[in-house]
Structures are given as C-alpha cells and as structure tokens.
Amino acid sequence: MSVSPLSPRMRTTLRAALAAWIVLLAFTLLAPSSAGPDWVIAHLAQALQGLGLPDVLTHPRRVENMLNVVAFVPLSLLGSLLWPRPSWRDWTAVGFVASFLVEVVQAVALDARSATHADVVANTLGTLIGALLGHLVWRILGPRASEGGADLPDRHASAEELEPPR
C-alpha cells in the first residue's frame, strides 16, 4: 500500500479545516431564516458593484449562484486531499447527493427557506471544481512525493501492485 505524502500534521490540519467548513455550511444552509445568507449576498453584490463590475455579474441572484458554487469547492477539495482514492466522479456524486438533501430539508422543514434545483446544480458544479482541483494538487505532488520515497495511491493499480512488499 502507498504511503501518503501528507504529513500527520497536514492531515490533521486538513481534517480540522474540513470539519469547520462542514459546520459553517450546515449553519448557513440549514438555518431556519435566510437573513444571514441574504445579508452576505447583498453586501457582496454591493462590493462587486463598487469594483465597477457590470450589473449582469453583480445582480443578487447571480451573486447567490456564484456563492453556491464557491461554497461546495472546499468540501471536495479538502476531502480529495484527505482521501485521494475516490475519483472526481465520486466526489461530484457525493456533492450532488449532499446538495439534494440540503434542498429537501429546506423545502420540507424550513418554511422561510426556498429550495431550488438551481442550487443543486451550482453546488454540484462547486463540488466538481473542488474535486478537479484536488486531483490537480495530487498530480503536482505526485512526482515530488515519489522522489521522497512516498507514492500516491494509484486508482487503477491491480491488487498485486497494492500489496505491501514482503
């Protein structure tokens, strides 16, 4: 079996960052009121307008959609750095299911929130982007890790190649 090129300290840091991001997302996405997210959207839209960006990019609905994409990037990025064996397709599927479940909870249990299919699409896109970024990081770290004697797990290795040396 391959040795992870990530130090134990780095793995602990990534786990803590992932846990913190999950808590922040749960607090934001499952809050009974949309006042917090609406405040962030309004202020970010205003800040983007202040930068001189065109109205088509600073409309609150466009900003909300962008934030829905960005919110899910860290989940699959951090997850794929911690657990590189699942492919970007696996992480994207996990993101789709998680986003779908969030929207179901918003539709069924949170009267002040609105569930939309556009949010599921945006969150899934964010998960895909994060997973691809994680894959890219592993591709970059791969040759460096191999030089140090540590190898990245091969997603397509045969069972014999994955067995430890005897």
Summary of predicted features, one role per range:
Residues 1-113, 131-166:
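Bulky hydrophobic segments
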Residues 113-125:
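Non-cytosolic membrane-interface motifs at loop->transmembrane helix junctions
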Residues 128:
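Gly/Ser/Thr-rich beta-alpha loop segments that engage phosphate groups in nucleotides
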